[in-house]
């Protein structure tokens, strides 16, 4: 909880961490067992970002501010809801030591917004689509994870949702069975309202997961 909140909010900031941990080590030196756990918990909670600041950051462009922490949180939500039938090693890395599962922007993040997305997100208004991109593209409600990011990219929403492997035997789009996609897979279009609503859902989950 402490490290997720700290990485998202930068509270306390990095330069204070060394002294914080040194003070905690000194305080628990003569303690044992649960007493150590309690002291560590209490000292970290005192300096941790309060709920209001944490929630505000979660509702903002969280990917733009900290993509690594965002990936960790999304993968943690997914891992908490995995079943034996649908399991994936979300922490696996490829031969280049990069994560196999990466963040996917549902509404594409690139500055050159595809025509299909201008039409869907802003009823054909290119200027409005650009503004929506600035306001919402990096918010958590517009994010999921995928092992096939390069295969989705700037595709239309329908194509991203229904994408299959080349041999047509595997769902590699939003129908891949992930918990994170359960409120995306049945949508016929992706809009700002749906991004906002999904942000509400995911923020609530994260506030509960990383609650003191």
For every predicted segment, state its role.
Residues 1-212:
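Flexible coil/loop and intrinsically disordered segments
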């Amino acid at each position: 909880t402490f490290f997720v909140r700290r990485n998202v909010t930068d509270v306390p900031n990095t330069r204070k961490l060394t002294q914080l941990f040194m003070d905690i080590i000194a305080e628990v030196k003569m303690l044992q067992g649960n007493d150590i756990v309690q002291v560590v918990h209490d000292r970290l909670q005192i300096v941790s970002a309060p709920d209001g600041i944490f929630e505000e950051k979660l509702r903002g462009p969280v990917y733009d501010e900290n993509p690594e922490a965002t990936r960790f949180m999304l993968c943690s939500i997914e891992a908490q809801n995995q079943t034996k039938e649908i399991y994936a090693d979300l922490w696996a890395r490829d031969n280049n030591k990069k994560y196999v599962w990466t963040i996917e922007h549902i509404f594409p993040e690139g500055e050159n917004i595809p025509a299909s997305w201008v039409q869907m997100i802003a009823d054909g208004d290119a200027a409005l689509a650009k503004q929506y991109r600035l306001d919402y593209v990096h918010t958590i409600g517009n994010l999921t994870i995928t092992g096939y990011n390069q295969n989705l990219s700037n595709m239309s929403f329908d194509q991203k949702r229904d994408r299959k492997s080349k041999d047509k035997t595997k769902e590699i789009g939003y129908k891949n069975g992930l918990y994170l996609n359960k409120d995306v897979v049945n949508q016929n279009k992706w809009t700002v309202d749906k991004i906002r609503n999904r942000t509400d859902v995911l923020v609530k989950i994260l506030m509960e997961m990383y609650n003191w």
